[in-house]
Regions:
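Bacterial N-terminal signal peptides that target proteins for export
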Residues: 1-14
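Sec/Tat signal peptide C-region and signal peptidase I cleavage site
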Residues: 23-29
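Cleavable N-terminal signal peptides
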Residues: 16-17, 27
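Signal peptide-proximal N-terminal region
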Residues: 54-85
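Extracytoplasmic ligand/sensor domains, especially the bilobed periplasmic-binding protein
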Residues: 95, 110-174
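Short acidic/histidine-rich motifs immediately flanking catalytic phosphotransfer sites
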Residues: 81, 105-112
């Protein structure tokens, strides 16, 4: 994975956390902002997608928590709250990811979740976030079906879907 995509993923994760502050009213009373990060840490997608995404996210979070990177409120972390990542492996399939997402929101009490690469996982977890009325930012789901088949108020995507990428590639190759 080239440097552009690693930086893009890290910026996505941090942007999601900032956006979550506006949506998560309860977070303002906390000392920490818990951010769930779901990406492949094992399996075939780990080396090219998941581990670089995790490393980039951890680097940016560490910089924000130290006050070494610009943050939205000119304070350490976000608005003075330290960012506490809760990192989960996406490997294991859609059924596992539905339970993992519920655990992140209900057991771990994360304020928001950023992640998901596998299209099947994205399709499975999006309705759960909507049901629980919790912010979910999908950063690399290739399927266009997520927003074609359903309407969400709490689920967002930061990257183009595979159809857009493929059309752009074909036009470029012409």
């Amino acid at each position: 994975m080239n440097r552009f995509w690693r930086v893009n993923r890290a910026v996505t994760i941090v942007s999601a956390a900032a956006m979550s502050l506006a949506l998560a009213g309860s977070a303002s009373a906390q000392e920490t902002f818990k951010l769930g990060i779901v990406t492949f840490l094992s399996g075939p997608a780990a080396d090219s997608f998941g581990v670089p995404a995790r490393n980039g996210a951890q680097f940016v979070i560490d910089q924000l928590n130290k006050g070494s990177a610009p943050s939205p409120y000119e304070k350490v972390g976000f608005g003075g709250m330290k960012i506490e990542p809760v990192i989960i492996d996406e490997n294991g399939g859609a059924t596992k990811q539905v339970q993992e997402l519920r655990n992140l929101y209900q057991r771990d009490n994360v304020d928001a979740v950023v992640g998901y690469i596998g299209s099947g996982d994205c399709l499975a977890v999006a309705p759960i976030a909507e049901e629980l009325k919790k912010l979910l930012l999908l950063f690399d789901c290739g399927t266009p079906r997520i927003f074609e088949e359903s309407k969400y108020n709490y689920v967002f995507r930061t990257a183009a879907h595979a159809t857009m990428d493929n059309v752009a590639l074909i036009r470029y190759m012409k």
